[in-house]
């Protein structure tokens, strides 16, 4: 029987029998895991507060055949502002949902782990949710092997010089007019949108609050990412 001490962020939880919780947790050392917290729904349980959705927690785990069992949990960091604001709570939920869909069980992804944490902190501190979400979505794609090509044509590799081009999900990024097929779904993409995507891709957590982007640009990035993320998942999705 193996035991582990790890740090994790709770993405989601559901009822599991009488008074128990089945949790999806991303961790530093074990990757994404499923874990049962026995008795976590009970009012007097010490695990209850430490295993709230979106909390950062030290967890002592025991491995069973099908999942991990949470023996002990100690909260490290909470984001109280998320729970008092419906829009922020939904934004955090979208981050958790996308992370769960793109992060396979048992795989390590320290860069994505850190960016989930950064994004929750930014939401909790009052940074514009739309810009936090677009930044997170682009970083998610980058850290899971789907970073969109935004500096040159994804087909012929012609450098982008600020013209009106197109974004193709199948090509994985921007496509020049000469390479755009007649058929298929392509999004017209203007220079300010390409510039905005690159700024969001490169922004650090410290610089993101200072990033000034027109809301129309942010909304256009959302439209493109909504289709691109859905394309990678194999199903249409809706972003906030």
From Swiss-Prot:
Key words, A-Z: DNA damage, DNA recombination, DNA repair
Example GO biological process: DNA recombination
Gene Ontology, cellular component aspect: bacterial nucleoid
SUPFAM superfamilies xref list: ArfGap/RecO-like zinc finger (SSF57863), Nucleic acid-binding proteins (SSF50249)
Coiled coil: none
InterPro entries tied to this protein: ARFGAP/RecO, DNA_rep/recomb_RecO_N, NA-bd_OB-fold, RecO, RecO_C
NCBIfam families (alphabetical): reco
Function: Involved in DNA repair and RecF pathway recombination.
Family: Belongs to the RecO family.
Name used for this protein in its record: DNA repair protein RecO
Organism: Carboxydothermus hydrogenoformans (strain ATCC BAA-161 / DSM 6008 / Z-2901)
Gene: recO
């Amino acid at each position: 029987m193996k035991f582990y001490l790890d740090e994790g962020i709770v993405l989601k939880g559901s009822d599991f029998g009488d008074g128990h919780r089945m949790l999806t947790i991303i961790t530093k050392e074990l990757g994404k895991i499923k874990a049962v917290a026995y008795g976590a729904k009970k009012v007097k349980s010490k695990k209850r507060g430490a295993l709230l959705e979106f909390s950062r927690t030290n967890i002592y785990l025991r491995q069973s055949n099908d999942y991990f069992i949470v023996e002990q949990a100690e909260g490290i960091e909470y984001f109280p502002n998320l729970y008092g604001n419906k829009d922020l709570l939904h934004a955090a939920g979208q981050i958790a949902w996308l992370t769960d869909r793109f992060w396979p069980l048992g795989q390590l992804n320290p860069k994505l782990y850190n960016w989930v944490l950064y994004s929750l902190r930014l939401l909790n501190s009052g940074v514009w949710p739309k810009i936090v979400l677009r930044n997170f979505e682009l970083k998610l794609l980058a850290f899971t092997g789907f970073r969109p090509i935004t500096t040159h044509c994804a087909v012929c590799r012609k450098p982008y010089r600020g013209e009106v081009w197109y974004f193709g999900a199948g090509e994985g990024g921007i496509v020049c007019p000469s390479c755009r097929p007649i058929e298929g779904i392509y999004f017209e993409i203007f220079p300010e949108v390409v510039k905005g995507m690159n700024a969001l891709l490169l922004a650090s957590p410290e610089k993101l609050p200072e990033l000034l982007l027109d809301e129309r640009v942010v909304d256009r990035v959302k439209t493109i990412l909504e289709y691109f993320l859905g394309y990678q998942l194999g199903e249409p999705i809706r972003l906030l």
